[in-house]
Amino acid sequence: MERATKAQIAYAEKLLRELGYDVEDYPLSEMGKREASKLIDDLKDELYG
């Protein structure tokens, strides 16, 4: 599994904070690229509708 990029992790953290989630609840540094991408897509859908 290819690990999530630093950019993916940083963007996911930004979205999580904007939505009021605790970043510590998400193992971002352990996620793969695909998993991080899906999380980002889900967070964007929640934030932007």
Feature locations, PLM:
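A charge-rich, low-complexity, intrinsically flexible signal that marks solvent-exposed coils, linkers
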Residues: 1-49
